[in-house]
Structure formats: C-alpha cells, structure tokens
Swiss-Prot record:
Protein name listed in UniProt: Valine--tRNA ligase
Catalytic activity: tRNA(Val) + L-valine + ATP = L-valyl-tRNA(Val) + AMP + diphosphate
Coiled-coil intervals: 878-942
Protein source organism: Xanthomonas axonopodis pv. citri (strain 306)
Subunit description: Monomer.
Gene from which this protein is expressed: valS
Record InterPro entries: aa-tRNA-synth_I_CS, aa-tRNA-synth_Ia, Anticodon_Ia_Val, M/V/L/I-tRNA-synth_anticd-bd, Rossmann-like_a/b/a_fold, tRNA-bd_arm, tRNAsynth_Ia_anticodon-bd, Val-tRNA_synth_C_sf
SUPFAM superfamilies assigned to the protein according to its UniProt record, in alphabetical order: Anticodon-binding domain of a subclass of class I aminoacyl-tRNA synthetases (SSF47323), Nucleotidylyl transferase (SSF52374), tRNA-binding arm (SSF46589), ValRS/IleRS/LeuRS editing domain (SSF50677)
Similarity comment: family membership: Belongs to the class-I aminoacyl-tRNA synthetase family. ValS type 1 subfamily.
EC nos: 6.1.1.9
GO biological process per UniProt: valyl-tRNA aminoacylation
Length: 944
C-alpha cells in the first residue's frame, strides 16, 4: 500500500531529505569515473542568499547532479570570500549597536581583527545554510574560506613569485578612493549615478602679456564676434580642483588657438603659471575647446599628465579635506566647502563667466554612497600587459570556451585595454601584504619576516615593520581554482586532487565580473600552474524584477529566494524591505508598492518550484525578468507530478516488475517512444547549457505526454478484461514515471527523491537514492518499431481533442454520454476507430459510434474535422441550435485564419525559396488539412 501523502507539501520533506543526503556523503567526490568539477563563485561571508546566487547556484547544481548521475566523479567546490571592505563595515556597525563605546580605531588592529573572527564564527555560515535550503549538492567538507591557512599561503606565494618576476611593483598612481572607508576600491565597487549638477565657466588669464584674436560664428558660419582676448575660458564641473591644475589643453589643429601653442596662463586664486599644451584628446566641439588639466584628480587628466610629463599636485587628504598643497585659506576645508569658497572668490575677481545646470555622472561607492575621488597615493600594482596577452590567447585559441560565444568580444575588449591592477587596500581585515620596510624606507618582500631577514642578512638590530595594507579580495579570488586544491603545498595538492580536478569543467557566473574575476583567474592560473582554470565559461544574464528593473534594496523590489521557498507574511515582507534603507524617507513608497504587489505576502512554493522557474527563465544572453507567477505555475507542476505518482502507485499495488516493459498497447509504445525522444533532448540541452529548453522539454513531456495523455490512455487498459495488457500498462506506467523522475531530478531534486523512493522498489531498484541512480540514456528502450503506434496515438489524441472541444463548446456535462457519427475519412480511419473504440468511448463518454455512408443525410449535429474524417455529435437534446450556429461560425473564422496564414507563407517567394524543402512541404500539407476542415465545417453549417 502506498504511503505517499495525499497532498504535495514540500515543507514536509525538503529539509529532511537534504539532511539525509548530506549525512550519507552523497555529495563527496567518488574518485571514480571522469572528473567533472564546478567552481562556486565564493559569495561574501557577510552576505545572505539573493536571487542572483539562487539563479546561478540552481544551474550549477543541475549540472553537478546530472553528471553525478552519469557516473562522473563530481566535485562542486564551494566556499566564501572574506570580503574585506564589507566585513569591516558589518563588524564596525555591530560594535556601534553593542553600545559599549568600542570602535575599529579604539580596538586597534589586532583587537579589531579578533572581533572579526568572533563575528565570522557566529554568523559567517549563514549563506551556506541558505544554500543547503536551495538544495545545492556541494561537498561541504571541502568548503574553503579565503582567509583559511591554505588559501592564505597561496596568496603569499603568488605575491612573492610575481614580485620576484617583476610583475608586482609599488608606485604612485591614481586610484578610486573612498573618503569614508579611507581606502582604495575597485572599479566594480563604484556606481556611476546620473545627478543634477552645474557647469561653471571660468576665465584663465594668459601670462606674459600674450593675447589673441578671438572669433565666434553662428550655425550658418556667419561671424558674430571678433575681439582681442588676453584670457581663455575653461568649463568645469569641479571648480575646487583648479587649485591642482598643472596645464590648460587645446587640440593641436583647433584654428582658434593656433597662436597660443606653448603659451602660459596664470592660474586664478593661486597665481601659479601653468603651460598651454596641445593634445588630440581634446574635443574641439565641446564648450570652448579649452580644457583644464588636473592630473592628480582625474583619470583622463592623469594619462595626459603622463604623456606631457606634467607635475601632479594632490589637493586632498584621505578624508577628502584640502591639504597643505593648496593656499593656506583652503586648508582643512571639506571638498564641498572648498568649492563654495573657490566660487565666491572667482566671482569677486570677476572671472566666473557663467553657471548653468548640467547632468553629471557621479562616481559613488556602492557601500558608503560617498562620492569617490580619483586619488594619488602609493599603492601596490600588478603589471598586466604580458599576463593579459596570454589570457587573450587562451580564449581565442579555443582552450577556454565562452557560452554564449558573443561574450568573447567583451573579454577581448577588456583585455586589449587593460591597465595595471591596483591590488593594495588600506584596511585591516584581509591578507596583509608580505612586504617589510626598514627605517630608511627600503622594501623587502618574502613569505614572512624570518625569510626576509635570512635572505637579506638583516640582523635583529635592524628594525622592520610590515606594510599595513592588505590585498584586495580579487587577488585571493583569482587563485580560487587552484588554491582550493592545495596549491602550492605538494602534500595538500595530492590530498585534494590538484592533478585530477584542475582544470574545472565549467564556471557559471555573471557578465559583470568577466574582467574582475574570470579574466584574472585565467591569467593567474596560467601563470602559476601552466593550465587553464576551466574549460567552459557559462555567462548568465542578471536577475531583474517582473518589470525589468534591477533588484536593489533602495528600490524595495528585492525578492529573497528563501521567502519564495518557505513563504513570508506581508507584515514581515514590508519590515524586511523597509529596514536598513540608505534613504529612510523612501520607506512609505516601498511599503505601498509592496502591499499592492503582495497583499497576502508570499506563499511557500518550495525549493523545487523555484529551481524549475529559474531553469525555465535561463535564456542565453538575456537579463531575466523574474515573475513570481511563474513559480506558482511550477509549484502546480510539482503538484501534478505528485498526483500522477499517486495514481500510478494506487493502480500498481502489489505489482513488482523488472527490466524494460514489453508493451501490449499502442499507447505504451507511444509513451516509450516519447520518453526516448525527450531523453535525447535532455542530454543535448545540458551539453549546450540550454536550461530554458531543458525545462520546456521536460515540462511538456511530464505534464502533457505523461500526466494528461498517457495516464488517461492507460485507464481503459487498466480497467479492461485483458490481464496481460493491464499488467504491461502498469509496468510501463511505473517504468516511464521512474525514468521521468530521474530526468527531472537535477532540476527538482526534492520532489523527485520523495516520489522515487515509492516508485523504485516496484521496479526492483535497490539503490539508496535517486541522486546516485544512473541517468536515462537514449536507447534504453528499443523504440525503432514503434512508428506506426506513434502515428496511431497521435491520431487518437486528435480525435479526443476535437471531440472534447465540441463537448466544451456545447457545454455538455462531463458525465453525459453522447452519440458519435463518423463520415468520410481515409482508408486508415475505419480500422483505427475499431482498434481504439474502447478508448474513445471511455475518454469521451460515448453512447455509441456509428458510421454514415457517403451522401447519407445527417441530423443536425455539431461537427469537427480530423484530417479527412468528419466527426458529428447529434444535437437533439444536447444544445440550443442558435448557439451551435454561432459556434460553427466561430470555428469557420478560425480555420479561415489558419488558411490565410498558410497562403501568406506559401505566397512569399522568400519563404518558398529559402526555407528547407521539408518545411515548405509541411506548410503545403497544413494548407490542405485546413482546407479539408473548412469544407466540412461549411457543409455542416449549411445543414443547420
């Protein structure tokens, strides 16, 4: 007797099953078979699971489970990133909330780092617990934290090697500087936001009594102004930085200023003389064609400064106040207070020409929201030219494949325009740079201080202090493919399978970190191991909300995947979306929108429904609009699968089968042939990373072919007196269902395991879990001789669909029996009707089936056409005749529309000449079928 619950309730078994899988060690690499390795992009240890994580991890897990079932030695390497800046912010915030008066600075470096480790021990595994709830089948025993001893040793080794090879150097460059965090940050941590600002035009006087003839023209080329000027007009959005100007720049071919090449100007407010230089960088059509150059505070100006050997004047302190390089009256002012004073003094001097509104792209730190400064500071850098050249070769030679392939263009663009990489950060939490300085400022690099002293003969009397900076997190993340496999320690490499699991099989990640992480892993892995880090890179789109908006806390449109899985009340959802906002004033707007979209909160969908939704939405190369309605639909899909399994189990009580079914009915042969086709499609879709087509194929087979059709077609055989047909039908039901559960398992692991545990024993299967059962293969069943059965059942389906449509349109109650009259048809139709009479009668509630002779008068009837066969349901006692006339008119219009579509295609020379011959022929056959149907419908309409 089946013990399967009467209703689908994922909360009753999902967590239980995961605990069983993990305890049994099913996710640990077997060490047997061909290796298949997937790298998890390590999420921040501070983070919680968001929809982007859930999206990518679902696809990774499907790939891992699929290959595990195919006998591969699967390793899914997981772990977390120490997330330097984010972690320091979280711990600093927690210290403030504790109310003990402790701060980062009051604790000091060692005390603060100790607090970070305390926090990590208490809260650092949150995201891994959430990943388990999603169903990720990763080897948790190998979970790695980037600050663990092994990865930390890899970081030191990589730094020392690159330094000794001349690839790492210390120098003064412009970096993105966050004045709140007081550290350099990466480009990825900068958000460019369009904001309203101003463009100020300022007169810069020419030095040395130089003047020139200034001429202006209107749009038609007519001269509107001619005068002698002893100044140039410069436009800027940041007037405070003029205190650090070291040149004014013109285009060398700008006819307006040809006489001013090599002139000088007197910088207002400072009195400094700076040169007028020429450079092709200048856009002559923008503004006056004159540009101020501030090399220490603008990335483009810095490049100009390098080309022209200009001095660099840094105006700011680490907190973006004015330093000693500016005139004394500005020193100590905040940058925006300095701006006000500069503008006031320019106006007093009469050199502020114009102020007008201007749209700005303002760089803001993604964590603090502060305006980021291009800041001149001493940092550590990696020389990228040679590394990037090799990294590009590895991709263009095909050793690494991008999916979809168009992302190679993005990769190439970045690699061909690469700059040296700033790897140092002014933080405490992270991998401290393995460099020491003596009192004279000389630098020594080594794995530790003892090695440095021994290598350079430095006695204890020579004081050394370690660089206080840490490496940015991308430096350790670039080593992830091989540091997790024990590199550089030979014993650890042997124990963790370095030689077996590198390169990994595929990296699943987003396009936004192709450069920041993917490219750097390619370069570093090649540099340190001589191998590629992975064979394939599958680039996903970004998850957006149903309206296509980016999900963000500030917009209040974030969906927590665990809320979709387990459900959340509207009050809790509102509280989650409105707490911790950077702009608390947005809370009422967010609450209103949330209550409108989710008046009753979010119901529990279960992990499988979310996972199947993600797969179905995973189209190539597009951002994903996540619609919660799709998840509801796929929860219904899981429920339908549950109910179909209950039907099969209840109709196979006491039955035990082994081997492949020997089908006795056409319906069995049809479903087995369909199973073979969907199995082949499944393998092809996995090979091409087409998870959307995979979900579509499996959904179509499970819902339509198996649940809607085969289960219904099986009922007559199960209730028939032919015991052999009933037995083979039971065997086929169980066999196809068990195969379907295996096909679905990588996408929906929980419900398939729960159902499979009930189904498998009836087929003599003793494997402990579906996750280790072999994946179905095309050819598991020899369906080569089933073509005629397939055609017969497709005909039967057409008959049933046509008659059901008639019954529905006539509003005939499901239980009421009707007569069926048949007329015309092909030579195959009569024997088919005879063979399928019991199925037709059972499925359509037919009182009788009778044939009419050609030309025989027919009673007023509702008509349908299947091929050349006319199906008639006498209307007497069934329907209002006026309603039937309306129905026929509607059906005639529908068929006429289909004929119009066919004629449109066949009337197009482009279609007929360019489409495959088989497609054109298929369209002609469709036109013939529709024309036959229209003739029959018109004849029937004429009779009533």
């Amino acid at each position: 007797m089946t013990t399967l619950a009467s209703s689908y309730d994922p909360s009753s078994f999902e967590s239980r099953l995961y605990a069983q899988w993990e305890a049994a060690g099913y996710f640990v690499p077997s060490g047997k078979g061909e290796p298949y390795t997937v790298l998890l992009p390590p999420p921040n240890v501070t983070g919680t699971l968001h929809m982007g994580h859930a999206f990518q991890q679902t696809l990774m897990d499907a790939l891992v489970r699929y290959h595990r079932m195919r006998g591969y030695d699967t390793l899914w390497q997981v772990g977390t990133d120490h997330a330097g800046i984010a972690t320091e912010m979280v711990v600093s915030r927690n210290l403030a909330l504790e109310g003990k008066g402790q701060t980062r600075d009051s604790l000091g470096r060692e005390g603060f780092i100790a607090k970070v480790w305390e926090w990590k021990a208490e809260s650092g595994d949150t995201i891994e617990r959430q990943m388990r709830r999603l169903g990720t089948s990763s080897d948790w025993s190998r979970s790695t934290f980037t600050m663990d001893p092994q990865p930390s040793a890899a970081v030191n080794e990589a730094f020392v090697r690159w330094y000794e090879q001349g690839l790492i150097y210390r120098g003064q460059r412009l970096v993105n500087w966050d004045p709140v965090l007081k550290t350099a940050i990466s480009d990825l941590e900068v958000e460019n936001v369009e904001e309203d600002g101003f463009l100020w035009s300022i007169r810069y006087p020419l030095a040395d009594d130089v003047s020139y003839e200034h001429v202006e023209h209107d749009a038609d080329g007519n001269e509107t102004l001619r005068e002698t000027r002893d100044y140039l007009v410069v436009a800027t959005t940041r007037p405070e930085t003029m205190l650090g100007d070291t040149a004014v720049m013109l285009h060398p071919e700008d006819a307006r200023y040809l006489t001013l090449h090599n002139a000088r100007i007197v910088l207002p407010l400072t009195g400094r003389h700076v040169p007028v230089i020429t450079d092709d960088y200048v856009d002559r059509a923008f503004g006056t064609g004159v540009v101020k150059v501030t090399p220490a505070h603008d990335f483009n100006d810095y490049q100009v400064g390098v080309r022209h050997d200009l001095p660099l004047i840094n105006l700011f302190t680490v907190t973006a106040t004015i330093n000693e390089n500016a005139p004394e009256r500005y020193r100590g002012l905040d940058r925006y207070d300095a701006r006000k004073l500069v503008l006031s003094e320019l106006e007093d001097l009469g050199v502020l020409v114009e102020t007008k509104p201007h749209k700005l792209q303002v760089p803001r730190g993604d964590r603090t929201g502060q305006v980021i400064e291009p800041y001149l500071t001493d940092q550590w850098f990696v020389k990228m030219d040679a590394l990037a050249k090799r990294g590009l070769e590895l991709v263009e030679s095909g050793q690494i494949k991008f999916v979809p392939p168009n992302w190679i263009n993005t990769y190439r663009h970045w690699m061909e325009n690469i700059q040296d990489w700033c790897i140092s950060r002014q933080l405490w939490w992270g991998h401290r740079i393995p460099a020491w300085f003596d009192d004279a400022g000389k630098c020594y690099v080594g794995h530790d201080e003892a090695e440095v002293r021994a290598k350079h003969g430095l006695g204890a009397e020579i004081a050394l202090h370690q660089d206080s900076d840490v490496l940015e997190t991308w430096f350790s993340s670039q080593l992830w493919p091989f540091s997790t496999l024990g590199w550089p320690d030979a014993q650890a490499m042997a124990e963790r399978g370095f030689g077996r699991y590198l390169p990994s099989s595929v990296l699943v990640t987003g396009f936004d970190i192709i450069f920041f992480w993917v490219a750097r892993m390619i370069m570093a892995t090649d540099s340190f191991t001589g191998q590629v880090p992975f064979r394939d890179v599958y680039i996903t789109g970004l998850i957006r909300d149903a309206q296509g908006q980016k999900m963000s806390k500030s917009k209040g449109n974030v969906l927590d995947p665990l809320d979709i899985i387990d459900g959340i009340s509207i009050e809790d959802l509102v509280a989650k979306r409105t707490s911790g906002l950077m702009k608390p004033k947005d809370a009422p707007k967010i609450e209103k929108a949330t209550r409108k979209e989710f008046p009753d909160g979010i119901i529990a969908h279960g992990a499988d429904a979310l996972r199947f939704t993600i797969a179905a939405l995973a189209t190539h190369g597009r951002d994903i609009k996540f619609d919660l309605g799709r998840a509801e639909g796929y929860k219904n899909f899981c429920n339908k699968l549950w109910n179909a399994t209950r039907f099969v189990l209840m109709n196979s009580e006491g039955a035990r089968f082994t081997g492949v079914p020997q089908p006795r009915t056409e319906a069995e042969k049809w479903i087995l042939a369909r199973l073979d086709k969907v199995t082949a499609e499944t393998h092809a879709h996995y090979a091409n990373y087409r998870f959307d087509l995979l979900a579509q194929s499996l959904y179509e087979f499970a819902w339509n072919a198996f649940c809607d059709w085969f289960v219904e077609l099986a009922k007559p055989a199960l209730n028939h007196q032919d015991a052999d047909a009933a037995a083979s039908t039971r065997h086929t039901l169980l066999f196809v269902l068990e195969s379907l559960l295996r096909l679905l398992h990588p996408l929906t692991p929980f419900v398939t395991e729960e159902l499979w545990q009930q189904v498998a024993p009836r087929l003599g299967i003793t494997t402990a879990t579906i996750s280790l059962q072999s994946f179905p293969q095309p050819g598991d069943v020899d369906t080569g001789s089933y073509a005629s059965a397939e055609a017969d059942v497709e005909w039967l389906k057409s008959m049933v669909s046509a008659l059901r449509r008639v019954r529905s349109e006539l509003n005939v109650p499901p239980s009421k029996q009707v007569r069926l009259l048949l007329q015309a048809g092909t030579a195959d139709d009569r024997p088919r009707v005879a063979r399928f009479a019991s199925q037709l009668s059972f499925l359509l509630k037919l009182e009788s089936i009778d044939w009419l002779d050609a030309g025989q008068d027919t009673p007023p009837s509702a008509a349908a056409i299947v091929g050349e066969l006319t199906l008639l349901v006498p209307l007497e006692g069934l329907v209002d005749m006026d309603a039937e006339r309306t129905r026929l008119d509607k059906e005639i219009r529908r068929v006429e529309g289909e004929i119009g579509k066919c004629n449109g295609k066949l009337g197009s020379a482009t279609f007929v000449q360019n489409a495959p011959a088989a497609v054109v022929e298929q369209e002609r056959a469709r036109l013939n079928d529709w024309t036959t149907q229209l003739t029959g419908l018109r004849e029937q309409r004429a009779k009533i």
